[in-house]
Amino acid sequence: MFDITDEAKVYVADLFAQQDEKDLGLKVDVEKAGTPAAVVTFNFCFPKELSKTYKKFEYEGFYAYIDELNFEYLKDSEVALKDAGTGKKLTITAPNTKGKEPKEDAPLEEKIKYVIAANINPGLASHGGFVELVEITKHMDVILNFGGGCQGCSSVKSTLEQGVEAQLKMSFPEIKSVRDVTDHSNTDNAYI
């Protein structure tokens, strides 16, 4: 599934040797798998805390646990040890984690979701927010719901009109309008 270089194996095994925990393992996850915002994470874990979908991989000096739901995203990946100025750090090259941009003939919904994930949500994430597609009406109105720091934010109207709507209409000229159906009365997590 993925390859760990010999140097990286020695480095990880040494990290485990320094821990005072007998059953500790390395959990490899892909957060937001299949989206442009995907990221691979490495964390210490105890196997008993993992769901049954995690499979065990044995290496000299440690065990890695990977959710079988992430196997396709980690295919052809490589974990290596790289120089990081003051020392070394683990890096992963994972060409399949982010998924692929939809093809030209893909459904409009799929293409809009991709643009939201790839181009819009990374900007909103800097304020702890996100937007998601609710539906596309037969009249080509795009209905969205904001969440996180965008829900209840006093700037959401300008974010919608000048940011999200402008970007979606530029990418998809067939869109007639972009509407927000979020309940903005809840301001508990609002950015401003």
Curated annotation (Swiss-Prot):
Keywords, ordered alphabetically: 4Fe-4S, Iron, Iron-sulfur, Metal-binding
Binding-site positions, [4Fe-4S] cluster: C150, C153
Manner of cofactor binding, per the entry note: Binds 1 [4Fe-4S] cluster per subunit. The cluster is presumably bound at the interface of two monomers.
Gene Ontology MF terms in the entry: 4 iron, 4 sulfur cluster binding; iron ion binding
InterPro entries linked to this entry: Fe/S_biogenesis_protein_NfuA (IPR017726), FSCA_dom_sf (IPR034904), HesB-like_dom_sf (IPR035903), NIF_FeS_clus_asmbl_NifU_C (IPR001075)
GO BP of this protein: iron-sulfur cluster assembly; protein maturation
PANTHER family from the UniProt entry: FE_S BIOGENESIS PROTEIN NFUA, IRON-SULFUR CLUSTER SCAFFOLD PROTEIN NFU-RELATED
Its biological purpose: Involved in iron-sulfur cluster biogenesis. Binds a 4Fe-4S cluster, can transfer this cluster to apoproteins, and thereby intervenes in the maturation of Fe/S proteins. Could also act as a scaffold/chaperone for damaged Fe/S proteins.
Subunit: Homodimer.
Family: Belongs to the NfuA family.
The protein's name: Fe/S biogenesis protein NfuA
The species this protein was found in: Ruthia magnifica subsp. Calyptogena magnifica
Gene name of the encoded protein: nfuA
